[in-house]
A protein has these predicted regions:
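HhH-family (HhH-GPD) DNA N-glycosylase catalytic core used in base-excision repair
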Residues: 1-370
């Protein structure tokens, strides 16, 4: 058990086992953090970083307790991330390379380039496998350390490196359907959409249309309203920020190919995000039911859209977009059915997979990629 005296001595043995919240700053740290130590009455200990976040504390930019302890290495112009097992960078790239008209990242020579924004600064990353690690390279002028490590945190969340999927794999090995998928796609992680506005907007864009056309609309939307970085002879786009869309009109969005209803719903969402009525921070502090009900209050957000966002952004393991057409097609193929399963069929099947619905869905989606 970490004592205040051990905290003062900066004992690193407790790093990752205990997280220290500082009431006066609203920051949580590792016990070994080199920052000035607060007085005893201003310290609160948390067993997990998630509890620290739920307590209203944000990650320290000196010790970065949000990153996996002992699994990241800042090398100046690059950052290396030691990946947890099981993990397959190749499988993740396979999923991310499904559509040739994807506009938010570029994959070439088993490397992925992506532009992100951290604290208002645009950064261009190249991510590649390096032995058992993932290496992040910064292609525009190298940012300072806090930005580099915030970029590493983004990649960890994007590739779901914070999650321990061992329990899912152990469960799947005993299941007649899932065991084939985890063996075939071993190491695949549930690729996320870390930004809440992007996740919900993308889900709204994709409602009731096929994925190929949805990607075309997304590209129109991004290149009309988003920012871009140039490197070499290529442009790298960032998803539009909520503030930019909140300042747009319905007719502006219709011009990129969206329906009037979808345009209205996306602008409403952008206003809610801009004023802070809905945020990722608020939602992840809720349980599944509370977050689900909050999302359903947004115009244009039904069961599928809510669960899609909860699965890919909020990381609820039980999120299940039960009406998803791709999910139904995957189940038809895996179960060798003559026709697609009904909603009740899907619900009955997933009742056997309680607590693993999100990962089961993602692996079934993966099975659709030739």
């Amino acid at each position: 058990m970490l004592t205040y005296e051990a905290f003062l001595r900066r004992e690193s043995d407790f790093d990752g086992q205990v997280f220290v919240g500082v009431k006066t700053t609203g920051i949580y740290c590792l016990p070994s953090c080199k920052a000035k130590k607060p007085r005893r009455e201003n310290v609160v200990f948390f067993p997990t970083k998630e509890e620290a976040v739920r307590g209203g504390f944000r990650s320290c930019k000196a010790c970065f307790p949000s990153l996996p302890v002992g699994r990241w290495f800042d090398e100046g112009h690059t950052v290396s991330l030691r990946t947890p097992e099981p993990f397959s960078f190749e499988e993740c790239l396979q999923f991310l390379s499904r559509f040739s008209n994807e506009c938010l990242h570029h994959i070439e020579n088993k490397q992925i380039c992506k532009a992100i924004k951290i604290d208002g600064r645009q950064t261009l990353l190249r991510i590649r496998k390096a032995g058992g690690d993932i290496k992040l390279e910064f292609l525009n002028p190298c940012p300072h350390k806090p930005t580099r490590l915030a970029a590493a945190e983004f990649v960890c969340e994007w590739f779901d490196l914070f999650s321990n999927v061992t329990a899912f794999y152990e469960f799947a090995e005993k299941d007649i359907v899932l065991h084939k998928l985890v063996r075939r796609y071993e190491g695949l992680r549930l690729i996320g959409i870390p930004d809440l506005f992007e996740a919900i907007t993308w889900a709204i864009i994709g409602q009731q249309i096929n994925l190929s056309y949805a990607h075309t609309l997304k590209k129109n939307f991004v290149t009309r309203f988003g920012d871009k970085l140039s490197h070499g002879d290529r442009e790298y786009w960032l998803f539009p920020e909520a503030e930019r869309i909140a300042g747009s009109t319905v007719d502006d969005l219709i011009q990129v190919g969206l329906t009037r209803r979808k345009s209205e719903n996306i602008i409403h969402l952008s206003n809610e995000v801009t004023v802070g009525s809905i945020s990722k921070k608020k939602l992840i502090n809720n349980d599944y039911a509370a977050s689900y009900e909050t999302l359903l209050k947004l115009p244009g957000v039904g069961d599928w859209t809510a669960n899609y966002a909860m699965m890919r952004c909020l990381r609820y393991p039980s999120a299940l977009p039960i009406s998803d057409v791709g999910l139904h097609n995957a189940l038809k193929h895996q179960l060798e059915l003559s026709e697609k399963p009904t909603i009740n069929d899907v619900r009955e099947l997933f009742s056997r997979w309680k607590g693993f619905e999100a990962y089961a869905t993602f692996y079934l989606w993966r099975s659709l990629i030739s």
